[in-house]
């Protein structure tokens, strides 16, 4: 009898394990690009529109336009890289506004040689300063695209492509497949091309409308998890009611003793600092990243300081510091999540837009620099920081300084989720303290501590 029950138990355990394994395989295989989204921008994506504008004797001419519909994630230098696989034996005769990185084997062609004969071409944007006869609208920005909220006018990129050895009608054309997008690194997942209604174009005088011969769309979504990137930013915290300054977590973006030669750090007190940061090199040499030696080893630190408390308002100071000696950030942006962001009264020296990732939930805001004033975050050094203050109106039903409520729930810099300190380390409200009172000692010591913290 005992052997019967032991065999039954063994069979049940094996069946349970098999069932769990099948569920895991099903859930893994059902993952699609639509699930690779950002919680604070659930509908954000990059949409590519492929418009066939005219037919040629052996193919077609198309205009490909990429729209960055992500609210705050932009594509920085060195820009996007687009790839796909042809459905048949298509070639690219010519391109305007972009180019392939390799020509491939075009040895079977005599006379006119195609621009690219590869089955899986890789396309990049042309650089600024390209001759006008090689440009089209929205091209030639080095692959850089701004986010939709920050600057929609520069959130698109286009190029023209002439395809040969392809179909010459709507019924014979085969759409490319296996699209890939690097922006500039990994993290984007692209879905299949879907044929949609042809795009319509209105002339500048608005008196005539034309349309493409054929149109298909490709949608790409981003996931920081798929990008498998180490964190690039961290958050530190302080407050007027507690002299404790909570720094970024140790090794938040890496540890000094684990850094390789290409990712070395530099002490700010190093003699001849400028010559170490910018050594003599051959033309075209790209220097590896070089960050300031810190406990956290992050290129970017965001400091959130609860500065003042009034009867009906409270004030926060935000400071963004760049610790990267060889990289500055043009048109940077910051996204913060906090329950009181629906009651912003005034923000100083930054642009601001409320984001509502979900209906009825207004706890997320996007901040970015004022053009020609502080939209440029310089490399590490005396000028490598930008700062602003935010004035909030209190909602008496929810406002408190207790249990870390005054600190952000999440911070993103340039679309990357920043490492937060553990909640149990947040500056706490002293015992017996109130919302409007704090110790005299804290008031005296805190400015000194903040000074030494940022000068370190």
Swiss-Prot record:
Removed propeptide positions: 432-456
Gene Ontology cellular component list: external side of plasma membrane; lateral plasma membrane; longitudinal side of cell surface; plant-type cell wall
Domain of life: Eukaryota
GO process terms (BP): cellulose microfibril organization; multidimensional cell growth; response to salt stress
Membrane disposition: Lipid-anchor; GPI-anchor
Record carries keyword Plastid: no
InterPro entries: COB_C (IPR056900), COBRA_pln (IPR006918)
Lipidation, GPI-anchor amidated asparagine type: 431
Subcellular location as annotated: Lateral cell membrane
Note: A partial protein missing the N-terminal signal peptide was reported to complement a yeast mutant defective in phytochelatin synthesis. It is therefore possible that COBRA binds divalent metals.
Role of this protein: Involved in determining the orientation of cell expansion, probably by playing an important role in cellulose deposition. May act by recruiting cellulose synthesizing complexes to discrete positions on the cell surface.
Family designation: Belongs to the COBRA family.
Protein name: Protein COBRA
Chain's gene name: COB
């Amino acid at each position: 009898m005992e052997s019967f029950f032991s065999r039954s138990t063994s069979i049940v355990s094996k069946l349970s394990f098999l069932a769990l394994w099948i569920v895991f395989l099903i859930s893994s295989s059902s993952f699609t690009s639509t699930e690779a989204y950002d919680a604070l921008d659930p509908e954000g994506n990059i949409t590519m529109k492929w418009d066939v504008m005219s037919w040629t004797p052996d193919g077609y001419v198309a205009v490909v336009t990429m729209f960055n519909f992500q609210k705050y994630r932009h594509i920085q230098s060195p820009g996007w890289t687009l790839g796909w696989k042809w459905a048949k034996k298509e070639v690219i005769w010519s391109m305007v506004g972009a180019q392939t990185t390799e020509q491939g084997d075009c040895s079977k062609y005599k006379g006119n040689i195609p621009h690219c004969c590869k089955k899986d071409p890789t396309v990049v944007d042309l650089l600024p300063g390209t001759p006008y006869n090689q440009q089209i609208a929205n091209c030639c920005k080095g692959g850089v695209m701004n986010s939709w909220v920050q600057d929609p006018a520069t959130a698109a990129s286009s190029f023209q492509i002439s395809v040969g050895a392809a179909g010459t009608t709507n019924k014979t054309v085969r759409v490319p497949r296996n699209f890939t997008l690097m922006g500039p690194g990994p993290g984007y997942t692209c879905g299949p091309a879907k044929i949609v209604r042809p795009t319509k174009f209105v002339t500048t005088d608005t008196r005539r409308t034309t349309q493409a011969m054929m149109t298909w769309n490709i949608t790409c979504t981003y996931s920081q998890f798929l990008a498998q990137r180490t964190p690039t930013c961290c958050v530190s915290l302080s407050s007027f009611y507690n002299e404790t300054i909570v720094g970024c977590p140790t090794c938040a973006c890496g540890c000094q003793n684990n850094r390789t030669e290409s990712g070395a750090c530099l002490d700010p007190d190093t003699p001849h600092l400028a010559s170490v940061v910018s050594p003599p090199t051959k033309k075209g040499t790209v220097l590896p990243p070089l960050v300031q030696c810190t406990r956290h080893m992050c290129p970017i630190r965001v400091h959130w300081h609860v500065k003042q408390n009034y009867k009906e308002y409270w004030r926060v100071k935000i400071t963004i510091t760049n610790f990267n000696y060889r990289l500055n950030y043009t048109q940077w942006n910051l996204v913060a999540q906090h329950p009181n962001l629906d009651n912003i009264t005034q923000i100083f020296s930054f642009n601001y837009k409320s984001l509502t990732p979900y209906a009825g939930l207004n706890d997320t805001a996007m901040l970015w620099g004022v053009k020609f004033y502080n939209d440029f975050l310089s490399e590490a050094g005396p000028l490598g920081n930008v700062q602003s203050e935010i004035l909030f109106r209190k909602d008496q039903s929810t406002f408190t300084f207790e249990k870390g409520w005054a600190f952000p729930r999440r911070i993103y810099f340039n679309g990357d989720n920043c490492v937060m300190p553990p909640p149990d380390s947040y500056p706490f409200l002293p015992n017996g303290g109130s919302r409007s009172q704090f110790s005299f000692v804290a008031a005296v010591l805190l400015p000194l501590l903040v000074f030494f913290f940022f000068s370190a």
